[in-house]
Amino acid sequence: MYGEACDKDTRVEPGSTARRITLAHTMHRTIFDTPVINTLLRLFSVAFLRITGWKVQGSLPPECAKSVFIAAPHTSNWDLPYTLMVAFALRLNIYWMGKESIFKPPFRGLMMWLGGIPVDRAKANNLVAASADALQAADGPLQLVVPPEGTRSKVRYWKTGFYYIAVAAQVPIVMSYLDYHQKITGIGPVLRPTGDLEADMVAIKAFYAPFKGKNPEQF
């Protein structure tokens, strides 16, 4: 359910209608900027993770207030609720990309309120450019969560849209993780894109290699 990556070429020319629509989706109001509910859900999330044996590691460096998050491994529908709870626990302000099918009525409003951005990869769109613009234009902290696998199924190659969003927005890439075997989750290393995609992807995949998703055979 949760998660949809984008490719480098999912872009259109600046000023197009599609550009304005996607940018509006990216900047919509979410549960993370709803004060009372945010506070209550943070208390619930911290308590739930602690009771169920999860350990939340790391914290977001100040220079990463605007950033692109890698979300991996992505192998289960459970990844979304855990991601949301970790975001509350770490006081993040996230938006996440999800496949268009989970945004259909009657769930569209709820999914967008939870920070979702619908992605329809069957159609040409401008998600990379619009997401980068949204990060740059944000008045406060904004973390865009992208699962580079793009699906819960096992894939040979990761999609690179997250990388090009970070390059275009001139923001760092934060490696976040969920390890269901060790029950650890949180924020890992920060990568500043060098422009050498191949070398940077080698470093990213090396970091994620030890982690096990809920369905490890799919990672």
Model-derived features: positions:
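Basic polycationic patches enriched in arginine
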Residues: 11, 19-20
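Extreme N-terminal tail/first-helix region
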Residues: 24-54
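Soluble catalytic domains of membrane acyltransferases
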Residues: 31, 51-210, 215-219
